[in-house]
Amino acid sequence: MKEMVEALRRHKKAFSCQARMIQFHDREKLDDGGNFYCSLGWGFARNKGKAIETCEKEEKIFSSCAGAAIYRKKVFEKIGYFDEEHFAYLEDMDIGYRARIYGYENWYAPKALVYHVGSGTSGSRYNQFKTRYSSRNNVYMIYKNMPFLQILLNLPFLLVGFGTKTLFFVLKGLGREYIAGIKNGFQISHREKKVPFKLEHCMNYVHIQVELWYNMFRRFFM
């Protein structure tokens, strides 16, 4: 906790800070070295399953995993708190994305160590509950945080990303749950929950978009 607090103090624009999350059952491997999101509509934990030494640098990340993070309260008061619709899965990506729109940063503090049991609540990496609510919340998060033109810009990538995931979960025997989640995501997308577009945030959207593209490369090659 001390290491994360000190990291927040070092970075005045930081909204959140995440610890280095190590797999509880294999303490030589990372569980999460910072959360990232890409134009395919995929969120991912950096270097998951790799050696813990691969994420030693304190640096900016797309968002902090709420499993081991701290947040600056005064920023919550400006941008709003966690969305109750995101009661499970991607709630941390959603709030971190929103903070980025407002010009804040999310940081990774490798000196702060947490041993994490992945999927400790849902029980397994792939199950009906997790599959349905992850796809649901992903659609909802995109709707909330991307202006209409940005959605159009990313649409070809999103179609590929969601199509690939659909095929993946069909092969896992979870295709029905994944598609049901997508449908539910559209159903809960309400205009009053969308982050209001403001001209003062234009450059923040540009920076986010460049990172969304770059993170596709990061996902497969880094």
Region roles according to the model:
Residues M1-W42:
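Conserved donor NDP-sugar-binding/catalytic core segment of glycosyltransferases
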Residues E3-E6, D94-I95, N137, E177-N184:
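Alpha-helical elements of Rossmann-like donor-binding domains used by nucleotide-donor carbohydrate transfer enzymes
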Residues E3-M4, F62-L113:
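A short, conserved alpha-helix in the catalytic core of glycosyltransferases
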Residues R20, N106-G118, Q128, L153:
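Catalytic beta-strand/loop signature of glycosyltransferases that borders the donor
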Residues L30-D31, W42-G43, K50-K74, A88, ...:
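A recurrent flexible, glycine/aromatic-enriched loop bordering the glycosyltransferase active site
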Residues Y115-R136, F169-R176:
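Nucleotide-sugar-dependent glycosyltransferase catalytic core
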Residues I151-M222:
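Non-catalytic, C-terminal membrane-associated alpha-helical segments of glycosyltransferases
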